[in-house]
């Protein structure tokens, strides 16, 4: 589906995320449509964006939500931006199903 902010790859998925640091809680809040029409997975973390802490918290949040090891989740692009591209390694079909369930709950 083109309206989803993730794309399956040979060894996992790539997810476009809009992160709100210092968001008051750690949560994934579903899919948001940006002004340019692109879909992003909206997430927030409690920590401030200093020394990569918000990126680490985001990776842990996604790993916990998908029930996978944190080492499977990395920031592929946008390390210093609110808009990030997250790489998740694993079975692509399983990850896409889990992301769809996660987005519906958000």
What spans do the regions from the language model cover?
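Contiguous, often N-terminal, cationic amphipathic patches that form binding interfaces
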Residues: 1-51, 55-59, 64, 70, ...
